[in-house]
């Protein structure tokens, strides 16, 4: 993926017969996904005309040029990106975009390299980081909380892991 793109959401399914879609958003407020103009997915651009919030991080959206359920079905699972330069500047060192975490080093408190962040998920109850553990070549998923990840160094491209007791 292009480092200059940030994922704002994913189209999960069609909604109704007139071309509306359900979109899982990764924006601070779900309705904000319509504020950024054209969104990018592969070689295509999409403009969200309207949104209705139906839940935490879930909206029903209408997209320019999509007028039927069949057209909406073709958009299922498409990720919607925006150029990073179009996003607001982050002023606080504790602020970052989720995409900034991907490929970051995961270090233990001793500064020993433990693995790498491979993905950020949210299945509804909070953010989860998928970590590729170097020593085992296995992937684990951990809740992205301050207790488990007490320090994030965006400029240094690493995150500190306070390893939970249940992981050996």
UniProtKB/Swiss-Prot annotation:
Its main location: cytoplasm. Gene3D superfamilies: PRC-barrel domain, RimM. Pfam families: PRC (PF05239), RimM (PF01782). The keyword Cytoplasm applies. Disulfide bonds: none annotated. GO terms for cellular component: cytoplasm; ribosome. GO terms for molecular function: ribosome binding. It is found in: Cytoplasm. One of its GO terms (biological process) is rRNA processing. InterPro entries: PRC-brl_dom, PRC_barrel-like_sf, RimM, RimM_N, RimM_N_sf, Transl_B-barrel_sf. Keywords: Chaperone, Cytoplasm, Ribosome biogenesis, rRNA processing. Residues 92-167 form the PRC barrel domain. An accessory protein needed during the final step in the assembly of 30S ribosomal subunit, possibly for assembly of the head region. Essential for efficient processing of 16S rRNA. May be needed both before and after RbfA during the maturation of 16S rRNA. It has affinity for free ribosomal 30S subunits but not for 70S ribosomes. Binds ribosomal protein uS19. The PRC barrel domain binds ribosomal protein uS19. HAMAP family: Ribosome_mat_RimM. Belongs to the RimM family. This is Ribosome maturation factor RimM.
């Amino acid at each position: 993926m292009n480092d200059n793109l940030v994922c704002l959401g994913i189209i999960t399914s069609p909604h109704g017969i007139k071309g509306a879609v359900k979109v899982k958003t990764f924006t601070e407020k779900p309705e904000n996904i319509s504020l950024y103009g054209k969104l990018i997915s592969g070689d295509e651009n999409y403009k969200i005309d309207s949104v209705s919030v139906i839940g935490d991080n879930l909206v029903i959206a209408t997209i320019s040029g999509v007028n039927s359920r069949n057209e909406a079905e073709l958009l299922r699972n498409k990720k919607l990106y925006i150029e990073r330069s179009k996003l607001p500047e982050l002023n606080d060192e504790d602020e970052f975009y989720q995409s900034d975490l991907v490929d970051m080093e995961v270090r233990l408190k001793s500064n020993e390299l433990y693995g790498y962040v491979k993905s950020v998920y949210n299945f509804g109850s909070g953010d989860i980081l998928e970590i590729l553990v170097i020593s085992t070549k296995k992937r684990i998923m951990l809740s992205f909380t301050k207790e488990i990840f007490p320090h994030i160094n965006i400029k240094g491209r690493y995150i500190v892991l306070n390893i939970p007791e249940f992981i050996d």
